[in-house]
A protein has these predicted regions:
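Extracellular "leader-to-stem" segments immediately downstream of a signal peptide or signal-anchor
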Residues: 1-137, 144-145, 151-155, 161-220, ...
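Extracellular beta-strand solenoid repeats
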Residues: 107, 130, 137, 143-144, ...
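Right-handed parallel beta-helix
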Residues: 159-162, 189-200, 227-240, 257-276, ...
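Intrinsically disordered, low-complexity Ser/Thr- and acidic-rich flexible linkers and loops
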Residues: 252-261, 374-381
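Short glycine/acidic-rich loop motifs that flank beta-strands on beta-rich extracellular proteins
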Residues: 145-149, 161, 167-169, 202-208, ...
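Flexible loop/turn segments at secondary-structure boundaries
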Residues: 144-146, 290-291, 347, 374-376
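Tandem-repeat/low-complexity and Cys-motif detector
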Residues: 316, 345, 377-379, 409-413, ...
């Protein structure tokens, strides 16, 4: 039985995803297929006028920089066959440099730290870390601190999750970050944190109290304006806001087309676990070149939001983020398993690649959107571009008390352009009431969407397996290929008015279904549709048939 609780080993995610697909494929070949899908008639945004500002001034003083569109970067395979960003070798070299600069090793116990869960060890940790260029060992135990700021060239290491816990002091203010970097304005570099449990100590707050104070405060670990960072084999427990936040110094809401300056870059997060988070598990803002691997986020509290309105995601690639890879991660019982998005007054995350993800009992397994750019009266998004996802699973999405008005979805694509999805398995629960909602929705002016090798089963109480919304806010330029529907919703594929679509290689089987494939308008191409068990197998532009029209 699948649970995916806080003790789930995220190193098992790759095997879990493979087993759930129920068929095997070569990941290198699959990634090439996804790239080809993405490159079919890719749309690029209009150029945004650039202001010439010296780099040093921009990094240190300017609060806002303009968004720059870049092509989707390449993914490589390492020696073990694991997908990695093209810049991973550069980060590995910087890790070697970090190791050379932190040969001096100290133990916090030698500076008076006591892991009894009572003693305030803030001063001992500060003395051990000093000005950096040191590897700091934290032994087994529970070490209370009032917060920790790490300088450049710092290597902080415990004895493992559950063995070494760093816990926030009971008198620490609600805004306090448990661990962060030293210099936000000037920036830091070469910081590594690993083999720890980080406990934000939410119990120090009143039970019904909102758990965060706004901005990027109240988290377990925050990297703000950090270049070259690593977080490995670390657990985050009950943070007020985020478990792990890779971010700029401040969030920026100066409008679509702008990004915050002083973001973080070249950060690798691996084997992380988080639960009880008030907002999101792992999140990025206005940062680039981020790699998130073999991590698991589950069971948020949602306490950073008003009850019933908690947009608490397992993995959130948020405002202004660019060039982010998520590889073999998992999420459970979150609002969104993976959300790629932006607020209405910020630039959307772009150039995001998901390669292996398992979503279990999330409300919306995969949610791609640019809020405030969905309706025809809204301005078109300048920045919501470029998402690729390969080998992903949505298992049994559910209604959630986190966001009570949100109905479950396996995937929702809104406002984004250039989205390619390949090898996507969606599995429902035949005994669960999905209240006739669609399982996968392409909507709200999403354009240039390609779905290939997508399978649905067991959503018997849903309304439609794959719905492309038409009307005034219609999606457009949608290509569907190799779609398999096995005794799932009563309506297989539903394409609304004003949508240009192409469909090929669909196999749909149902018992007493309503229709297998319906399109209000003629489709550009339709071929190899094997549909049975529906009252109306095929309906295109009002004409029905058991064969291709």
């Amino acid at each position: 039985m699948i649970i995916l609780g806080k003790n789930h080993d995220p190193l098992e995610n790759g095997n879990l995803i493979k087993q759930t697909h129920g068929y095997s494929f070569d990941i290198e070949k699959a990634l090439k297929e996804t790239r080809l899908l993405y490159e079919e008639d890719t749309h690029c945004p209009r150029p945004i006028n650039k202001r010439l500002i010296p780099l040093l001034f921009r990094r240190v003083f300017q609060k806002t920089v303009q968004y720059e569109y870049t092509e989707m970067p390449n993914t490589l395979l390492d020696q073990e066959g694991t997908p990695v960003p093209y810049w991973k070798s550069q980060l590995d070299q910087e890790y070697t440099n970090l190791s050379k600069e932190t040969k001096r090793e100290v133990n916090v116990a030698d500076f008076g730290a006591i892991g009894d869960g009572k003693t305030d060890n803030t001063a001992a940790f500060q003395k051990a870390i000093g000005k950096g260029k040191v590897k700091v060992i934290v032994p087994e135990g529970v070490f209370i601190i009032k917060g920790l700021r790490l300088p450049s060239w710092t290597f902080l290491e415990g004895m493992g999750k559950g063995a070494t816990t760093i816990k926030l002091h009971p008198l620490a203010p609600k805004s306090r970050r448990l661990i962060t970097n030293m210099h936000y304005r000037r920036g830091n570099h070469h910081i590594l944190v690993q083999n720890l449990s980080l406990d934000w100590n939410v119990e120090r707050l009143n039970h019904n109290e909102n758990s965060s104070t706004g901005s990027n405060r109240s988290s377990c670990l925050t990297f703000a304006n950090v270049k070259y960072g690593w977080v490995r084999n670390t657990e985050a427990i009950n943070p007020g806001l985020h478990c792990f936040d890779i971010t700029s110094v401040r969030y920026n809401y100066s409008g679509d087309g702008n990004r915050a300056s002083r973001g973080s870059e070249f950060i690798w997060m691996d084997q992380l676990t988080g639960y009880g988070f008030g907002d999101d598990g792992i999140t990025t803002h206005h940062s680039q070149h981020i790699l998130i691997t073999h991590s698991h986020m589950c069971d948020p509290s949602g306490r950073a939001h008003k009850k019933g309105f908690s947009n608490s995601n397992g993995f959130e690639i948020d405002d202004g983020s660019q060039n982010v890879w998520l590889v073999n991660n998992s999420s459970a019982r979150c609002f969104g398993g993976v959300e790629i998005k932006a607020h209405h007054n910020s630039s959307a995350a772009s150039n995001v690649q998901i390669i292996g993800h398992f979503s279990f009992h999330d409300n919306r397994s995969y949610n791609f959107r640019h809020i405030g750019h969905h309706y025809k009266e809204h301005p078109e998004s300048k920045t919501a571009y470029n998402i690729m996802a390969t080998s992903i699973v949505a298992m049994a999405p559910v209604f959630s008390d986190l966001y009570t008005d949100s109905s479950p979805r396996g995937m929702v694509i809104s406002a984004y352009r250039n989205v390619a999805i390949n090898h996507f398995t969606l599995i429902g629960d035949r005994n669960y009431d999905y209240k006739k909602n669609p399982v996968l929705a392409i909507q709200y002016r999403a354009q240039n969407i390609r779905l290939q090798n997508v399978s649905f089963r067991d959503f018997s109480t849903a309304g439609t397996d794959l719905k492309v919304f038409g009307g005034d806010n219609h999606a457009d330029q949608v290509i569907l290929s190799n779609i398999t529907i096995d005794h799932s919703s009563p309506k297989g594929i539903d394409i609304g008015a004003n949508v240009h679509a192409s469909i090929k290689n669909v196999k749909a089987d149902c018992e007493q279904g309503e229709y297998g494939m319906k399109s209000v308008n003629p489709v550009a191409h339709a071929s190899s549709l094997e549909i049975q068990g529906y009252k109306i197998p095929i309906s295109i532009a009002g004409k029905t048939s058991n064969r291709i029209l």
